[in-house]
Amino acid sequence: MPNEPRESSPAYEAVLLIAFGGPTQMSDVRPFLDNVLRGRPVPPERIEAVVHHYELIGGRSPLNELTFRQARALETELRAHGPALPVYVGMRAWEPYLHETLQRMRAAGVRRAIGIIMAAQQSDASWGRYQREVDAARARLGADAPQVDYVDEWHAHPLFIDAVSDRVAAARTQIPAERRAAAQLLFTAHSVPTAMAAASPYVEQITDAACLVAERLAQAHWSVAYQSRSGSPREPWLEPDIGAVLRALAQRGTRDVVVVPIGFICDHVEVLYDLDIEARQIAEAVGLNFVRNV
C-alpha cells in the first residue's frame, strides 16, 4: 500500500480523519443544508422534509461526536503501539472545516500528514470530493499548508470485516435462535448515480465487503440494497432500493431481516432516519421483523 505510513518513513507528523460533518444542534440544520447544497436548486418542500428528519432523530447528527471519538481512540492506539502521532479531524460540510483544521495543523508545526477518508468504499462522492476539498483547503492556506497523503482503500481489511461481523452477530441475537439461519442479511450503502458508480470500484467493493462478512458469519442468505437516493429523478441511480428489496423479501416468505449499513462507519441521518425510521416502517408494514446492527 504505497500511500500508507511505514516505520521506515517517519516523516508523517499527524493523522487527519476526513469526514462529511453534520449539524450538532437543531439551529445548525438549515445552515448545514445550505453548505451541502452549495447553491444547487432543491424544491423547498424537500429541504423542509430533511429538516423534519433531523427533528425526528433528536435535532442533531451524532457524526461529529462519533468521529472525534474515533480520533481519540486512534490516538490512544498510536500512543500504545506507535508512531505516537496527534490525530486531527476535518469536515467537508460543517465545523471543523478542513481548511480550519489544516490551519491548526500548520500552526502546530505539522508539515506532512496521513489522511484517512472515513468511508470504506470508493466513489467520487465518497472519496474524490473529499480529496478535492483537501486540495482546495491547502490552496487556500498557501505554499506552507501541510501536505496530505492518503491511506489506501480499506473495504476488505480484515479488521474492518471483523468489526462489522461482530456487530452483525450481536444484532442476530435479537432474532429467535431457531430462525437465525433463515434470516436475511441486507447490506446497504448510499446510492449514487450509475454513471459515477461505473467510473469507480464502488459497487464491487460494497459487494466484496458484504460477501466477506456473510462468509465470516456463515450466513447463506444475504443481498445488497441501496438507500438515501437524492438528485434528479430523471438521472439513473444505483438500485435496488432498500424499500423494494424489503417488500420482495416479504413476498417470498422471509420473516427476519438484519440490515447492515456497510457503506457507513458511524450513525448519522441516513442511518437514524432513512433506516431506523423509514425502512423500519416499510418492513413492519409488510410483516418483516427488522433488526439493524449498531
Regions found by a protein language model. Give the residues of each.
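Active-site-proximal alpha-helix that buttresses catalytic centers in soluble enzyme cores
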Residues: 2-294
